[in-house]
Amino acid sequence: MSSVRLPSVDRLLRSAAAAPLHQRYGREALLATLRDLLDELREPARQGALAAIELSEAVLAGRAGERLAAQHASRVRRVFNLTGTVLHTNLGRALLPEEAIEAITLAARYPLNLEFDLASGKRGDRDDLITGLIRELTGAEAVTVVNNNAAAVLLALNSLGARKEGIISRGELIEIGGAFRIPDIMTRAGVRLHEVGTTNRTHARDYEAAIGPRSGLLMRVHTSNYSVQGFTASVPTAQLAAIAHGHGLPLLEDLGSGTLVDLTRWGLPKEPTVQEALADGADIVTFSGDKLLGGPQAGLILGNRELVGRIKKNPLKRALRVDKLTLAALEAVLGLYRDPDRLAERLTTLRLLSRPAVEIRAQAERLAPALAEALGEDWEVAVVDALGMIGSGAQPVARLASAALCLRPRQPRRLRGRTLRNLEEALRGLPLPVIGRLDDDALWLDLRQLDDEPAFRAQLPRLRGELS
């Protein structure tokens, strides 16, 4: 094959085939892509390894368009979370209700009174946007908000216990992942760790014996991401608060996931509420916004007015504060808690957590034939009972009755590993990636969180091509 002459960059830029790319991506991006493409093709063209059709304006514009589309594709992708873990940290945790999404849109589009008092016309405090709601819902005297619960714990410890001892049970020195360990956070906050008791048993007398002139605070951490069972003992919040207050010390309680309602009302496992912690005497309570609360990522610090005031004056507070979008979403979510009778209908996280297993199984029965057709005869598709998890460290032992599509290759067990990994990759490669979980030589798609059934069903035919 003889050599073929490459078209010039200028000619391609002015071609009708490239016009839509120019309009969509701009001249600079298109120019750079065309230059790179032509540089790659120059030697093969000189050697005669390319046909003339491969260097036509239409073909080259098409290849440039593919590259530009890949370069400009958003790194943030919507996915189907079919892992069975509702509050999946790697998949974004809580899904926001429509009220919060509308509030974010409003805050993003228009100026708002973020730190402006409309009554006085003077500078305001951004925490005031949710203070009234928090007081109404929890009875707390004051509140401040930072960007996550790790920041809330760090800020509270640094503000109330710097250069002093923080007394905590040895059984509560937790790690929640991502290098967040309570002992390390206390050290970073300038608090000297004074651990008491043992891993499985800590008594009131252990705290009493530890309190001295260097004590700054007592700390209690809800061990939400693991469970110690058997021969155990711990000191309830009310008793611990009495000990702390008897010595003039504050009690800081970190609830981790945190909730404002009794979840047993919806058939879910019991989790300590913020109101209970405050009623039992905790001076400061910290918890997450994007876990059981069902809101945006945030760390809430609430409790005693004087102590919250000290926390708000800490210079670190400005470095950790939340923006207008977070506050707008948080206010909208908190507002839903005013009507607990309709909370499961309106709060997306609670609706998904409390979704009946019989409803999930019915959905699985509807989808099984379509998935079996898409995968072909080499796969067994079965509707099975499943046990999901709340996730994000909440109730690690508890399981949520659910249903799943269990996908198992019809081949010897020793060969299934690669086949299952190929299916995982194919599902992740769909326009709306599907994330399941591997278990017992099968790929499980737990449907508890499958809200958009039509979109899921519509892309199933693509699987056959992805797997071939």
From Swiss-Prot:
Transmembrane residue ranges: none
Catalysed reaction(s) here are: L-seryl-tRNA(Sec) + selenophosphate + H(+) = L-selenocysteinyl-tRNA(Sec) + phosphate
GO terms (molecular function) for this protein are: L-seryl-tRNA(Sec) selenium transferase activity
InterPro entries per record: PyrdxlP-dep_Trfase, PyrdxlP-dep_Trfase_major, SelA-like, SelA_trans, SelA_trans_N_dom
Sorted keywords for this record are: Cytoplasm, Protein biosynthesis, Pyridoxal phosphate, Selenium, Transferase
Q: Does the keyword Protein biosynthesis apply?
A: yes
Which residues get modified to N6-(pyridoxal phosphate)lysine? 291
User: Which cofactors does this protein require?
Assistant: pyridoxal 5'-phosphate
Enzyme's top EC category: transferase
Any single Pfam family the record assigns to this protein: SelA
Gene Ontology annotations of biological process type: conversion of seryl-tRNAsec to selenocys-tRNAsec; selenocysteine incorporation
Q: Does the keyword NADP apply?
A: no
The record's GO CC annotations read:
cytoplasm
Superkingdom field: Bacteria
Name the pathway.
Aminoacyl-tRNA biosynthesis; selenocysteinyl-tRNA(Sec) biosynthesis; selenocysteinyl-tRNA(Sec) from L-seryl-tRNA(Sec) (bacterial route): step 1/1
Name the SUPFAM superfamilies on file. Answer: PLP-dependent transferases
Location of the protein in the cell? Cytoplasm
Entry's EC annotation: 2.9.1.1
Which family does the similarity line name?
Belongs to the SelA family.
Q: What does this protein do?
A: Converts seryl-tRNA(Sec) to selenocysteinyl-tRNA(Sec) required for selenoprotein biosynthesis.
The protein's name:
L-seryl-tRNA(Sec) selenium transferase
Q: Taxonomy-wise, where does this protein's organism fall, top ranks first?
A: Bacteria, Pseudomonadati, Pseudomonadota, Gammaproteobacteria, Pseudomonadales
